Amino acid sequence: MESNIILVVILGISIVGKATSVAISVAALLILKLLGLDKYIFPYLNDKGMFWGLVLLTAAILIPIAQGNVKAIDIKNNLVSFVGITALVLSFLTTYLSGVGLRYLTVQGHSDVMPSLILGSVAAAAFLGGVPVGPLITSGILALLVKMVKKS
């Protein structure tokens, strides 16, 4: 019962904070619990959910390439530019940090920090126009760095 209350609070905060992806996720979990399907679906989501979520996210990010909107010459030119090199370095760093974070939350057993992470994501979505999605963090950091470099 306590878990339902926590999820409802997170749902409310995510709705108020306009973090739609978080709200949909929480609502789906609550519905699964209410239908009694949690004992069947939660173990699979717990085990494979992150993987399949990343697969879908990666596929969505690769759509411009799949549609032919990004050509090989564009990639080549980008890879040798300041923005491209910075993107590679930041992607390397954030991917490494994501792995460290995932191990911290799962292997090291600090899943209790998840509500704070969700709240931070929701607050950033509500007040800063952010999007609570992992790989997009890299492009956000990149955009800020590029903006700083262009100002100087």
UniProtKB/Swiss-Prot annotation:
Record-level GO cellular component terms: plasma membrane
Subcellular location: Cell membrane
Regions that span the bilayer: 5-25, 50-70, 82-102, 117-137
UniProt KW Cell membrane keyword: yes
Membrane-topology descriptor: Multi-pass membrane protein
Cited InterPro entries: UPF0756_TM
Matches recorded under Pfam families: DUF441
Record has Nuclease as a keyword: no
Entry keywords, A to Z: Cell membrane, Membrane, Transmembrane, Transmembrane helix
HAMAP family: UPF0756
Protein family membership: Belongs to the UPF0756 family.
Protein name: UPF0756 membrane protein CA_C0092
